[in-house]
Design a protein with these regions (language model features):
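Glycan-recognition and catalytic cores of secretory/periplasmic carbohydrate-active enzymes
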Residues: 1-299
Length: 299
């Protein structure tokens, strides 16, 4: 499951038409049921929940891989379960069920996995695709009577068990400035009120500013480009310079770039800015707002 083009908009169509087209809710519910039954699995070392693929059909093997595109899913699950209301409001309604609780827990777990795709890299930016280590055969979430416990937080310890679950292939280490994870963080913050989602979103945005913000090219008297970093600089020096330059208001910037390798410091830029990068700016700028500043739900 790599494309949000259909699934994501089923529930949004239902909500944005004030529930007047229930067929879209039914289609969403059917899609989510299939995802929960066939595509959710646990990682081998820390029981992170992943939304995997079955490229050969339901009778084929599970392929433990997540594209960044899939990270729209946790926020959308929470949006659907609560109808766009806060979790406290939704749980107070007589229509709330134990299955809604399970959906919210699933949203939390998938959000954590998507956040792990950022934390696993040296730049703090997600690769386009992450593969995962799972048991053989994979343990499906649907096969367990109760959810398996996963780490409450993804530790910064380089030897933390959760890191062993990630396998980022060399051809998948590029970052195209996609907005799916930060969108889910925004929904999770607005719906649950959990501060960690604001913190994760802001940390993510700071990484984008640090590593993808492009300065105007500086040249010496002979017209040669002055490089921001020298080839023999150590990683800590590069990190310090990157952090300082985003605060330098005297510099002129010319946009943000996709990068070719999230595990290189500094990462090689591609000198192109994707159109959907602008959406990434929308959500971090709303994350600092308290719930009573902007009303997103009109009854």
């Amino acid at each position: 499951m790599t494309d949000s083009a259909i699934t994501e908009y089923l529930i949004k169509q239902y909500l944005q038409t004030s529930g007047q087209e229930p067929i879209y809710h039914d289609m969403w519910a059917q899609a989510l049921t299939g995802v929960r039954k066939h595509l959710l699995a646990y990682t081998e070392h820390s029981n992170l929940t992943i939304l995997a693929e079955r490229p050969s059909g339901l009778a084929g093997s599970l392929f433990p891989k997540m594209d960044h595109l899939v990270c729209f899913m946790p926020g959308t699950i929470a949006l659907a379960a609560t109808g766009g209301h806060t979790l406290a409001h939704a749980k107070a309604q007589p229509t709330w069920t134990a299955d809604h609780d399970a959906q919210i827990e699933l949203a939390h777990e998938l959000t954590k996995t998507c956040w792990g795709m950022y934390k696993i890299s040296k730049t703090g930016l997600s690769p386009e695709i992450a593969h995962f280590h799972v048991a053989n055969p994979a343990v499906l979430v649907a096969s367990e009577a109760t959810p398996r416990p996963s780490p409450a937080e993804l530790s910064d310890d380089p030897d933390a068990p959760w890191r062993k679950d990630f396998d980022v292939h060399s051809g998948d280490r590029h970052n195209l400035q996609r907005p799916e994870t930060v969108e889910s963080l925004f929904y999770m913050w607005r719906i649950t009120g959990d501060e960690k989602y604001r913190e994760w979103g802001w940390e993510m945005f700071e990484a984008f500013e640090k590593w993808t913000l492009l300065e105007e090219v500086e040249r010496d008297a002979d017209g040669n480009q002055i490089m921001q970093y020298s080839d023999d600089e150590d990683e800590e020096s590069v990190r310090a310079k990157a952090a300082a330059r985003v605060l330098d208001t005297a510099k002129t910037y010319r946009g943000f770039s996709s990068i070719s390798d999230v595990d290189k410091i500094p990462p090689p830029t591609r000198d192109n800015m994707e159109s959907f990068w602008l959406v990434c700016h929308e959500y971090p700028n709303r994350l600092p707002c308290e719930h009573n500043v902007i009303d997103y739900h009109h009854d």
